[in-house]
Amino acid sequence: TGVNSAINSGASSMPVIRGLSDDRIKIKIDGMDLISACANHMNSPLSSIDSSNIQQIKVFAGLTPVSMGGDSIGGSVVINSMQPDFAKSDEKIFKHKISTFYTTNNKASRVNISSSIASNKLSFNYNGSYIDAKNFKAGKHFKDSRLSATGRQFIDGDEVGSSAFKDGNHMITLGSRKDNQLINIKL
């Protein structure tokens, strides 16, 4: 209740909790506090993890427990990425998944790839995504057609300039477990 998102870039959105957003909300990914990736806050901290690599999201509206970092007036978003896969007993795991999509408005194409190779003690996981999108089109002409500000391309009257983007996220997870202990390295 009271949680929404403001889409301010093609790469991610900014969480809004009870009308507060941006630096008024604490965002933790795998235990690390993150802030916007650029000075004008176009890419929120959520742009540093792909949605296909999320295992759990917890949202705290308003006051946040000290165990989750406290220090936020709007609330907190706590994200945990996928944990490594391990095989049962002496089996081996070989899992691979590819998904893709395409949108016609801005000719956006995206691919997600995940791969896991594991025994019952060691695990290697890769999760990657890449998206490439052109400028999107408005419902009708809203301006005169002209050259872009850089003079390198022509922008139609229904085209929203500077809305094109490319984005990629990659995560490699190495895991080792023995008895009740897990060592996890994420790059």
Annotate the PLM regions.
Residues 1-33:
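Extracytoplasmic beta-strand/coil segments of soluble accessory domains associated
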Residues 62, 80, 99-105, 118, ...:
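Outer-membrane beta-barrel pore domains and translocons
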Residues 8, 47, 52, 91, ...:
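Transmembrane beta-barrel outer-membrane domains
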Residues 13-16, 28, 44-47, 59, ...:
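N-terminal periplasmic accessory domains that precede
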Residues 41, 99-100, 155-160:
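Extracellular loop and loop/strand-boundary signature of outer-membrane beta-barrel proteins
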Residues 34-63:
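Short acidic/polar hinge/loop motifs at secondary-structure boundaries
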Residues 93, 110, 114-187:
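Periplasmic-side early beta-strands and strand-to-turn transitions of outer-membrane beta-barrels
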Residues 22, 34, 82, 103-105, ...:
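Structural signature of outer-membrane beta-barrel domains
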